[in-house]
């Protein structure tokens, strides 16, 4: 030590020249190497002292146990004498240990004072060396690496030239006893022993750096202080010292505070030599830090592994979650008004989706919302699809409305999405309130519920000019419209924007009348096709014609456009059919306009399907949907049997959309149902194909899903069509109310044969080869 003290003041004298810098570098490297060696020796000494302490403690424990076993058979006076001797002996040992410790502390203090001058010089050397390395050798990374290493540095692999603060200055003022022992003041073997009374290690390594637990760098292993493994691990750089305070600052390499820390630790050592914490208290004090590190590490790993929730992506997998069921089969088109960023271009499809005059949205706002909102959205998507291809002329109004609706804020979307979740309860109460208004038309079986729908349908064109300016605001009030999935925005939101003929206000009122359908109305299913063609070709004029509520309304071009519309229906329905697959109610519309002789067809708005050569948006159904096909088939047979036997309209049970609210066993049947419709609609133009359509799609949901049974598109159809009604069809078709007991009086028949046309079989095979067997033979 003394040669160091004599030699190290010299580096301060040389000048600033190149030779001085070279000398500084050489001497600095030598000093840092010396400090590393010294640090290693101190760590080794601390480990040896710890092992010695452990040995002595074990020896004392063994002796105590032997004494206890020896005194078992002796008499009480003898045991009392032994206890007195043991107590006196322990007091002597404690006194001896305390004297040794005090002597060692005095020697340490002397060494610290002697080294106080060296600290400043070493710090200067470190600074100069680091500057030289940065300027000349450009090895700042190595410098940082050496700084981050544990200061014990027993197995450090750094080269001798890397002089870092943690390697030099920290080791100088570390509170270990190596300097004491180098001064030839080695004490008796008990110097490292502990005071027996408090079990506190008062060994040579007073430095808490060597008295606390060691944690491996990966955080998996902890070596508690008084243990042989700790004594070995303290010499290895592979472990981190669980310390706060001085040692952490040393590890960070804050050499500027080295002298202050040294003096503070010296004072602490002199003041607290008799009050050092026990190993257990040291562990408890250091354990929170290590546990915090471990918790943070685990949390970071968990956060890395956690996948973000993808709520906005449409999924093709079968899912019972209501929002995912809605988002899964949405169109690629994005509805601009619902808060889509203005940067997204509005394509031709969007323009057609915007063709709804503001009245449609107005009626939506005013109309009550009820649980089948998801179903209404999907059925509206059907209508939307048909209009994409067949209604370019009606896009002028929607195109004019588009710029306004583009400014709907995204917050509106989020708020409305929250409202959607709250509507389950709200919709039920609103549904009850609307049942009162919907029950009154029961008395007039011919045209009862049609009048409100017609009146609203007639008001829509007039409201167009008034509501254009309000289109951005209602987005907040339309929870059913605003799901954030761009991929499904068409099926969720734009469905409401299809045409003014949709009357959403009736959607809740419609449910009580699901069964109030005229059996004869089913025969007028072809009217739906004609009516839809009329809506596509003569929409502006028909829309504004007030019709009497009690009359059947026929469109002027009914007979002319019927065939034409059936052909074109193949175009718009295909994509709508597959996008409908998300919800049970959607599939009904396709079969509706072709089910001329089926009383159970649901009078849903007729939607056309694409021809085969234009169908490009097929989606493959996952194998789990085969169960849904089977269910749909079963229900179709059941409904077919009922309708074939009695040829009357079944009363649908209270609506419960399996996707939106109850994850029932039929939750995927809607997907296969819409699949059937989309495949069946354009199979052929004969009645056999019509028959198959009804069997697979409409009747299935009419019985099992609590869907609407009956072809008429009356007020009760507003629910199944997603809360929107074709006003022309409202005027066109009458209804006859059928009392609810019909459903219960008529037994449910579950085993029925189903005929499928050859074209239908081909189309079903195209989707799922395994499901054809189910559909035709089960």
Swiss-Prot record:
The modification Phosphoserine is found at residue 769. Disruption phenotype: Mice die within a day of birth with malformations involving the spine, genitourinary system and distal digestive tract due to disrupted germ-layer morphogenesis at the primitive streak where cells undergo an epithelial-mesenchymal transition. Urogenital defects due to impaired hindgut formation start at embryonic day 8.25. Dvl2 and Vangl2 are found increased at the primitive streak, associated with abnormal distribution of E-cadherin. The keyword Flavoprotein does not apply. Residues 432-443, 694-704 have a biased composition (Polar residues). Keywords: Coiled coil, Cytoplasm, Developmental protein, Neurogenesis, Nucleus, Phosphoprotein, Synapse, Wnt signaling pathway. Residues 85-149 are annotated as: Required for self-association. Residues 1-40, 305-324, 359-386, 397-416, 428-468, 544-616, 694-721 are annotated as: Disordered. A motif (PDZ-binding) lies at residues 768-778. Involved in regulation of intracellular signaling pathways during development. Specifically thought to play a role in canonical and/or non-canonical Wnt signaling pathways through interaction with DSH (Dishevelled) family proteins. The activation/inhibition of Wnt signaling may depend on the phosphorylation status. Proposed to regulate the degradation of CTNNB1/beta-catenin, thereby modulating the transcriptional activation of target genes of the Wnt signaling pathway. Its function in stabilizing CTNNB1 may involve inhibition of GSK3B activity. Promotes the membrane localization of CTNNB1. The C-terminal PDZ-binding motif mediates interaction with the PDZ domains of DSH (Dishevelled) family proteins. Can form homodimers and heterodimers with DACT2 or DACT3. Interacts with CSNK1D, PKA catalytic subunit, PKC-type kinase, CSNK2A1, CSNK2B, DVL1, DLV2, DVAL3, VANGL1, VANGL2, CTNND1 and HDAC1. Interacts with GSK3B; the interaction is indicative for an association of DACT1 with the beta-catenin destruction complex. Interacts with GSK3A. Interacts with YWHAB; the interaction is enhanced by PKA phosphorylating DACT1 at Ser-769. Interacts with CTNNB1. This is Dapper homolog 1. It comes from Mus musculus. The gene is Dact1.
């Amino acid at each position: 030590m003394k040669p160091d003290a004599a030699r190290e003041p010299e580096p301060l004298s040389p000048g600033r020249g190149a030779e001085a810098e070279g000398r500084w570098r050489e001497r600095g490297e030598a000093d840092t190497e010396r400090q590393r060696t010294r640090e290693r020796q101190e760590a080794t000494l601390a480990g040896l002292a710890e092992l010695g302490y452990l040995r002595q403690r074990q020896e004392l424990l063994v002796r105590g146990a032997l004494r206890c076993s020896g005194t078992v058979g002796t008499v009480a006076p003898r045991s009392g004498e032994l206890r007195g001797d043991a107590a006196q002996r322990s007091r002597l040992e404690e006194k001896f240990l305390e004297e040794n410790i005090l002597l060692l502390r005095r020697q340490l203090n002397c060494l610290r004072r002697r080294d106080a001058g060296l600290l400043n010089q070493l710090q200067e050397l470190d600074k100069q060396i680091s500057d030289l390395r940065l300027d000349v050798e450009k090895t700042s990374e190595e410098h940082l690496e050496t700084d981050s290493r544990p200061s014990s540095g027993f197995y450090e692999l750094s080269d001798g030239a890397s002089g870092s603060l943690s390697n030099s200055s920290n080791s100088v003022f570390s509170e270990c006893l190596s300097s004491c022992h180098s001064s030839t003041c080695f004490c008796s073997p008990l110097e490292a022993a502990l005071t027996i009374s408090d079990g506190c290690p008062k060994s040579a390594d007073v430095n808490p750096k060597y008295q606390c637990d060691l944690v491996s760098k990966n955080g998996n292993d902890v070596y508690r202080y008084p243990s042989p493994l700790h004594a070995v691990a303290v010499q290895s750089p592979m472990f981190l010292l669980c310390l706060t305070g001085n040692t952490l600052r040393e590890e960070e390499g804050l050499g500027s505070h080295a002298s202050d820390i040294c003096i503070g630790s010296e004072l602490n050592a002199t003041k607290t030599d008799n009050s050092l914490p026990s190993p257990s208290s040291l562990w408890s004090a250091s354990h929170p830090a290590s546990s915090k590190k471990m918790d943070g590490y685990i949390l970071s790993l968990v956060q890395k592994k956690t996948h973000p929730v993808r709520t906005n992506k449409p999924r093709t997998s079968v899912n019972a979650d209501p929002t995912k069921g809605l988002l899964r089969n949405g169109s690629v088109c994005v509805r601009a008004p619902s808060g889509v960023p203005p940067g997204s271009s509005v394509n031709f499809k969007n323009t057609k989706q915007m063709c709804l005059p503001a009245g449609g949205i107005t009626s939506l706002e005013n109309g009550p919302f009820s649980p089948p909102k998801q179903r209404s959205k999907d059925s509206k998507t059907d209508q939307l699809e048909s209009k994409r291809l067949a209604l370019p002329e009606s896009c002028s109004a929607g195109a004019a409305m588009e710029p306004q609706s583009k400014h709907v804020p995204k917050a509106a979307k989020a708020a409305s999405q929250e409202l959607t979740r709250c509507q389950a309860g709200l919709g039920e109460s609103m549904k009850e309130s609307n049942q009162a208004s919907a029950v009154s038309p029961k008395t007039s079986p011919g045209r009862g519920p049609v009048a409100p729908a017609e009146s609203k349908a007639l008001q829509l064109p007039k409201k167009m000019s008034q509501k254009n300016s309000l289109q951005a605001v209602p987005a907040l009030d339309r929870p059913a419209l605003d799901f954030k999935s761009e991929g499904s925005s068409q099926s969720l939101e734009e469905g409401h924007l299809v045409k003014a003929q949709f009357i959403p206000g009736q959607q809740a009122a419609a449910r009580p009348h699901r069964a109030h359908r005229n059996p004869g109305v089913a025969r007028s299913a072809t009217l739906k096709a004609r009516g839809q063609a009329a809506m596509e070709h003569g929409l502006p004029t028909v829309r504004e014609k007030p019709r009497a509520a009690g009359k059947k309304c026929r469109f002027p071009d009914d007979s002319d456009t019927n065939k034409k519309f059936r052909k074109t229906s193949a175009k718009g329905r295909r994509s709508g059919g597959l996008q409908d697959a998300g919800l049970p109610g959607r599939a009904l519309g396709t079969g509706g306009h072709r089910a001329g002789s089926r009383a159970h067809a649901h009078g849903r708005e007729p939607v056309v399907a694409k021809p085969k050569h234009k169908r490009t948006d097929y989606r493959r159904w996952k194998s789990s949907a085969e169960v849904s096909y089977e269910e749909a088939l079963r229900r179709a047979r059941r409904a077919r049997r009922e309708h074939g036997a009695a040829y009357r309209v079944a009363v649908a049970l209270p609506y419960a959309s399996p996707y939106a609210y109850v994850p029932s066993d039929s939750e995927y049947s809607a997907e296969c149902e819409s699949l059937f419709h989309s495949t069946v609609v354009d199979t052929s133009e004969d009645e056999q194909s019509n028959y198959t359509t009804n069997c697979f799609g409409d009747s299935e949901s009419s019985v099992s899903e609590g869907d609407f049974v009956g072809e008429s598109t009356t007020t009760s159809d507003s629910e199944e069509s997603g809360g929107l009604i074709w006003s022309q069809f409202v005027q066109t078709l009458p209804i006859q109310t059928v009392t609810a007991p019909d459903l219960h009086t008529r037994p449910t028949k579950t085993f029925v044969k189903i005929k499928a046309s050859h074209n239908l079989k081909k189309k079903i095979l195209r989707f799922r080869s395994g499901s054809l067997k189910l559909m035709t033979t089960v």
